[in-house]
């Protein structure tokens, strides 16, 4: 383990169009090989599609989708006397948001179809309606934590 002092948290600059830190974090997760302008284009295209289909504010729907995909508890491996236990632990808000964004991008990429903007828009709309793979992943994470509740006293 590093003996240095822990690294300073970097502040996230909000995106230029919506002035949202969450949208900026999403762009960072979408970005591939440093192509940030392409990631912005994909996100904004997805927001335009959401606006067309629902008529609602796409940023509100996006925030709702992230809230619905954010896990509250997770299991972490803890080794005790030769045995490894899956210990349920609460998730800090920043980590929960990061996990939700990662899952939204991951399951958007796995969807069938051509355009990433369309796939992302569909995943965001599904997550906002509490369906979709990213919300299912959160439910699985919660189930795992519930199943391993007996090992909660090993928390660290």
From Swiss-Prot:
Among InterPro entries, the record links this protein to: Ribosomal_uS7, Ribosomal_uS7_bac/org-type, Ribosomal_uS7_CS, Ribosomal_uS7_dom, Ribosomal_uS7_dom_sf
Q: Which UniProt keywords apply?
A: Ribonucleoprotein, Ribosomal protein, RNA-binding, rRNA-binding, tRNA-binding
Question: How is this protein annotated for GO cellular component?
Answer: small ribosomal subunit
Gene3D superfamilies in UniProt: Ribosomal protein S7 domain (1.10.455.10)
The GO biological-process annotations, alphabetized, read as: translation
Mention one GO molecular function.
Answer: tRNA binding
- Give yes or no: UniProt keyword Manganese: no
Top-rank taxon, per record: Bacteria
Q: Which SUPFAM superfamilies match?
A: Ribosomal protein S7 (SSF47973)
Family according to the record: Belongs to the universal ribosomal protein uS7 family.
Function description: One of the primary rRNA binding proteins, it binds directly to 16S rRNA where it nucleates assembly of the head domain of the 30S subunit. Is located at the subunit interface close to the decoding center, probably blocks exit of the E-site tRNA.
Q: How does it assemble?
A: Part of the 30S ribosomal subunit. Contacts proteins S9 and S11.
Identification of the protein by name: Small ribosomal subunit protein uS7
Q: Which gene encodes it?
A: rpsG
């Amino acid at each position: 383990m590093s003996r240095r002092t822990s690294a300073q948290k970097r502040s996230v600059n909000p995106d230029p169009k919506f002035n949202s830190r969450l949208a900026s974090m999403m762009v960072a997760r979408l970005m591939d090989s440093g192509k940030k302008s392409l990631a912005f284009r994909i996100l904004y295209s997805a927001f335009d599609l959401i606006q067309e289909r629902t008529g609602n504010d796409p940023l509100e729907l996006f925030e709702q989708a992230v809230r619905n995909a954010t896990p509250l508890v997770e299991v972490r491996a803890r080794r005790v006397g030769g045995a490894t236990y899956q210990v349920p632990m609460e998730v800090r808000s920043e980590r929960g948001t990061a996990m939700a964004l990662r899952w939204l991008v991951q399951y958007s990429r796995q969807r069938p179809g051509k355009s990433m903007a369309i796939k992302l828009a569909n995943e965001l709309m599904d997550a906002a309606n509490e369906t979709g793979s990213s919300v299912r992943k959160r439910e699985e994470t919660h189930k795992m934590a519930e199943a391993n509740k007996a090992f909660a006293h090993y928390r660290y």
